[in-house]
Amino acid sequence: MKKKLSKKYSFKEVEANKLLFWQENNLFKAQINSTKKPFTIVLPPPNVTGHLHIGHAYDFTLSDILMRYKKLKGYDSFIIPGTDHAGIATQTKFEKNLKVNAQTNRFNLGRELFLEKLKIWKDEQINYIHKQWNALGLGLDYSNYLFTLDPIVVQTVREVFVKMFNEHIIYRDKKLVNWDIQLKTAISNIEVIHKEVEQKLYYIKYLSQDQKDFVVVATSRPETMFGDKYLVINPKDKRYFHLHNKIFINPINNIEMTVILDDYIDIEFGTGVMKCTPAHDFNDYELAKKHNLEIINIMNADGTLNEKCGEFKGLDRLEARSLIIDKLQKNNHLLKVESYRTSVGFSERTNEIVEPYLSHQWFIKMDSLIKDTIKMQDDCNNKVDFYPNRFNKTLLTWLKNTEDWCISRQLWWGHQIPVWYHKKTNQIYCDTIPPKDLENWIQDEDVLDTWFSSGMWPLLTTKWNYNSHFFDRYFPTSLIVTGMDILFFWVSRMMNFSQYLVEKKPFKDVLIHGLIRDSQGRKMSKSLGNGIDPFDIIDKYGLDAMRLFFASCTTIGEDLNFSTERLGANWNYLNKIWNIAKYIENLDEINDNLNFEDVDKFCDVNKWILTELSKLTLEINKNMDKYNLVVATKYLYDFIWNTFASYYLEYTKVLLQDLTLKNETIKTIRYVFNKILIMLQPFAPNISEEIWLCLNQTNNSILLQEYPIINFEFETIIIDKIAKIILEIRKLRLEENINNRINLCFELISPNDAFYKSKIKLVNLLLILVNAEINEIKKTSSNNYTYELVIDDFILKTSYEKPIDYVFQMKKASEQLNYLENEIQRATNLLNNSGFINKAPAQLIIKEKNKLINLKKEHANLLKTLTDLKQKVK
């Protein structure tokens, strides 16, 4: 039975089962033994915490568009999907679920049972993510799916850790780190959210030991005073230089404090004197290392003050703050308090204020890794290409200022560090397998930062250490699409690991996109309530409309503002394409396809559309190869909506009436539209597939077609001129209210009259569309004409005299009458307004009175004209 397109475009019908159709035909799997050139995209692995947000949809859709494009271009093109165990995010969410649903916590369960339950929950989450991927219509190679805690990944991560440990790249040390007091773990910079908050600035008086001098220090964190043994001044500050090396007394615990010099201190900021708290401030920590200062930790892992804080021991640091201020005030050391706004770091997961905290952690020495990555980027033949290119410079700037990477986390969920400590000797054992006498050893309880395993993602997904055939074919991968917000945390890590482990770049290209913001340009957040669910968009506008929105609004490297108007416009665009397809479906069937040998004999209109199609394919290929989707979609939109639909298909309505042109025209229409569908496929795969299958009466997917590169080039200037003639005649009819039923006859005046005479048959054929014709062509003309249309190198003249349209004139007179009545009422109200009469300048009042007189005269004259017109109509 012949397949038919439904009468109306319904995205729900069109998009149903398309992904299943492609999957059943194995269109998204790697072709390991193919001779095709590979094009591999590694999907950024979403966290296994559940619901995919619009940022995920954006990221994944761009990857899918480019995968489909390359597949149509003849590549072995596929996407490798995966999910990330996401240590902190997953453990935090699961612990909340435990608390709500089971009224317990991980400590009650113990590590083994907790992880067992979490793995079951993780499997449910991954199944949900797979369903969401399918709902997004993504063509993923599930046969190569990977999870960052799969056994092969665990083994690989251990091997890499051991290698780096043995080469002294990984080391353990006590350093200052970002600390979440609720989770009791170190966290990365990306997990710190900075918010502007109002805080108090306390001005505290410090007396010298000999009672002869005092200084004032401003601090927002008086609770950290228990860790202070130094005051710091700028050596260029003449106010305080004489105090260098002098001893002052800490007013909270009476400990001696020494004044030291450092040009880090800003003379103009605050009082110019700074207290130094190395264990609880990153800048102070650097000062301590520089001057070899004592570092005193005054805080426990849960944010309470420790034994160094005397009577305040055991209190939360924020609770203790007010009590400490009370004590300072009673002792006359608090001089004043000011409010000010400042940026404070909060934990993304718990919303707790992040504390700089001194603790034993594992670190990676970054200097050698960074040098190798920078060297790679300096090699034009081996570097990773960034789109846009400015992000290469951004990345290199970051790398040059990178400190050693803290890779340990005080969690249970993740890659447990493969290090054991001897119970008696504290000897360290590091290997991929536990020590033989395991009963004498204790394994390090910490797990690795999620970015450690994610940093090896291109290596892991291409089976680096266990399938050389797959790895050699697909590594380096071709492309990764990601947001600028994780350029340093993820992209740079992948470059570091690949260069270190295999001395190759991990991918050839990186496409960087910005954030999706709301319609007002604001970042989406829970507090603003402006988040957008991609599945709500799909339900309302359809998957293809959303894909077109992402593609047509994506200027690489820039943020994207969400717009329901653009989504609605995309639906209209798809509906237009559907209606075009319906028009083509109803054309007479022509058995033979377009024969290129016959094209030279085609009429100029069909040659023109083939030439325009050739130009289109050139532009789209060029821009798609540069990942410039916004330009590619614009070219395609303009061609479909304007060139093809508004002009060419309109022309074909008269061409199809000519039996000598009918067959070639139907062939051309179908040929051009099929090429349009192939170019549309990456952006709107569902509608293009549905139309392709129906119009071509085939079971073979459009994805098996060849992406068009067409080289028709005909001289078709006459078609451009005809288009201008039609446009000008339509404007003339509209402006002069000339009925479309009236045939307009023109003379064409041009020095190039021979050219136009040679094309007159075609010109008049197409002018049927506007009920007009050219009945004479001359070089010059001296006759008088009613209308003249000046177009390019010719003039169209007609002596048509329009009959007086009394009804039209009545309509215009009535509209003007209404306008005058409104103006008269406005002027009358103004002159009756005592406020205006009393306050306005006399000159302005006179002007308004004269205006009212003239309005009334004009109204009276127009009323008489309207009465006369009504009589004539009768």
UniProtKB/Swiss-Prot annotation:
- Catalysed reaction, written as an equation: tRNA(Val) + L-valine + ATP = L-valyl-tRNA(Val) + AMP + diphosphate
For whether the record's keyword set contains Ligase, the answer is: yes
Q: Which residues bind ATP?
A: K526
Q: Which family does it belong to?
A: Belongs to the class-I aminoacyl-tRNA synthetase family. ValS type 1 subfamily.
The taxonomic lineage of its organism, from the top, reads: Bacteria, Bacillati, Mycoplasmatota, Mycoplasmoidales, Mycoplasmoidaceae
Enumerate the Gene3D superfamilies for this protein: HUPs (3.40.50.620), Isoleucyl-tRNA Synthetase, Domain 1 (1.10.730.10), Valyl-tRNA synthetase, C-terminal domain (1.10.287.380)
**Matching CDD domains:** Anticodon_Ia_Val, ValRS_core
Quaternary state and interactors: Monomer.
The answer to whether keyword Transmembrane helix applies is no
UniProt main location, coarse: cytoplasm
- This protein's GO CC annotations: cytosol
Q: Which residues form a coiled coil?
A: 805-874
Query: Main role?
Result: Catalyzes the attachment of valine to tRNA(Val). As ValRS can inadvertently accommodate and process structurally similar amino acids such as threonine, to avoid such errors, it has a 'posttransfer' editing activity that hydrolyzes mischarged Thr-tRNA(Val) in a tRNA-dependent manner.
Keywords on this record? Aminoacyl-tRNA synthetase, ATP-binding, Coiled coil, Cytoplasm, Ligase, Nucleotide-binding, Protein biosynthesis
Q: Motif 'HIGH' region: residue span?
A: 46-56
Stated name of the protein:
Valine--tRNA ligase
Please indicate the residue ranges that the annotation assigns to the motif 'KMSKS' region: 523-527
User: Which EC main class describes this enzyme?
Assistant: ligase
Q: What is its EC number?
A: 6.1.1.9
What does the record's free text say on domains? Answer: ValRS has two distinct active sites: one for aminoacylation and one for editing. The misactivated threonine is translocated from the active site to the editing site. The C-terminal coiled-coil domain is crucial for aminoacylation activity.
Q: Where in the cell is it found?
A: Cytoplasm
GO biological process, alphabetically ordered: valyl-tRNA aminoacylation
